[in-house]
């Protein structure tokens, strides 16, 4: 892969003190070209998921209805339901927004944005439009220093050095994931961001006005706990954290794919971002020679455990590339 680890990784049992630096292109574009040349029928999988709208509408309705039922519940009950139920729904919607960022519900981009704003409602915090801007750069510039905001900052990586700090980082990783690009690579908001913000504030205010603060708190708690020490959140780590220096993207082939828009098929997704999650398994079926030899996971919970307990793994365990030089 043409990668080199930073100082401190060479010694067994010691956490890296720098990222893994790659001096080759990210692997997905090359693999995409090879697979399409060998298996051109892959192109038949391209295009929107016709059931995306119905699936999103069902989850949004169920989560908002649940929030209204908990308006007079105890805080213990609200937190319990949020962790064991609401977190799965809100994380499902977060990954629906990921799907929509690739225009995989409709062929018209603006329709996907509107559906993303709708899917955003139970999450409680406006993020759909902003996520799309940064996520597409993650695909186009995977690992590129200063552009790919999926990678932890230097401050995060230097602060998180042991089991305890990694545990805290995992609990709050959703905050780091959301706030990192706003500090490191802020983008000026546009009309779509303001639309997302206004509609979200209207929903939040309506929840408080008609049902009380506890209903809104349930929605936000569902988002927070579902993005931390939670099985669904394991994909944040499993996708690109390097447990093997020879591989920078990892797939997950476990049952939670059914609830997460099959985001676990992450090598397949980066190879073919125009294929909706419901069809990604077919990529592996058509071209098994490209995927069966790659390391993969069957448990996101195990990935979280490995990340926390392995003393050689931490926020520095990511592959990075130097930004391309601009023509003078």
From Swiss-Prot:
<dbReference type="GO" id="GO:0046513">
    <property type="term" value="P:ceramide biosynthetic process"/>
</dbReference>
<feature type="short sequence motif" description="Histidine box-3">
    <location>
        <begin position="266"/>
        <end position="270"/>
    </location>
</feature>
<keyword id="KW-1133">Transmembrane helix</keyword>
<feature type="transmembrane region" description="Helical; Name=6">
    <location>
        <begin position="217"/>
        <end position="237"/>
    </location>
</feature>
<keyword id="KW-0472">Membrane</keyword>
<feature type="transmembrane region" description="Helical; Name=1">
    <location>
        <begin position="50"/>
        <end position="70"/>
    </location>
</feature>
<keyword id="KW-0256">Endoplasmic reticulum</keyword>
<feature type="short sequence motif" description="Histidine box-1">
    <location>
        <begin position="98"/>
        <end position="102"/>
    </location>
</feature>
<comment type="function">
    <text>Sphingolipid-delta-4-desaturase required for the biosynthesis of delta-4-unsaturated sphingolipids and derivatives.</text>
</comment>
<dbReference type="Pfam" id="PF08557">
    <property type="entry name" value="Lipid_DES"/>
</dbReference>
<feature type="transmembrane region" description="Helical; Name=5">
    <location>
        <begin position="192"/>
        <end position="212"/>
    </location>
</feature>
<keyword id="KW-0444">Lipid biosynthesis</keyword>
<keyword id="KW-0275">Fatty acid biosynthesis</keyword>
<keyword id="KW-0276">Fatty acid metabolism</keyword>
<dbReference type="Pfam" id="PF00487">
    <property type="entry name" value="FA_desaturase"/>
</dbReference>
<dbReference type="GO" id="GO:0006633">
    <property type="term" value="P:fatty acid biosynthetic process"/>
</dbReference>
<feature type="transmembrane region" description="Helical; Name=2">
    <location>
        <begin position="78"/>
        <end position="98"/>
    </location>
</feature>
<dbReference type="GO" id="GO:0042284">
    <property type="term" value="F:sphingolipid delta-4 desaturase activity"/>
</dbReference>
<feature type="transmembrane region" description="Helical; Name=4">
    <location>
        <begin position="164"/>
        <end position="184"/>
    </location>
</feature>
<keyword id="KW-0443">Lipid metabolism</keyword>
<dbReference type="InterPro" id="IPR005804">
    <property type="entry name" value="FA_desaturase_dom"/>
</dbReference>
<dbReference type="InterPro" id="IPR013866">
    <property type="entry name" value="Sphingolipid_d4-desaturase_N"/>
</dbReference>
<comment type="similarity">
    <text>Belongs to the fatty acid desaturase type 1 family. DEGS subfamily.</text>
</comment>
<keyword id="KW-0560">Oxidoreductase</keyword>
<dbReference type="GO" id="GO:0005789">
    <property type="term" value="C:endoplasmic reticulum membrane"/>
</dbReference>
<protein>
    <recommendedName>
        <fullName>Sphingolipid delta(4)-desaturase DES1-like</fullName>
        <ecNumber>1.14.19.17</ecNumber>
    </recommendedName>
</protein>
<feature type="short sequence motif" description="Histidine box-2">
    <location>
        <begin position="135"/>
        <end position="139"/>
    </location>
</feature>
<dbReference type="InterPro" id="IPR011388">
    <property type="entry name" value="DES1/DES2"/>
</dbReference>
<feature type="transmembrane region" description="Helical; Name=3">
    <location>
        <begin position="114"/>
        <end position="134"/>
    </location>
</feature>
<keyword id="KW-0812">Transmembrane</keyword>
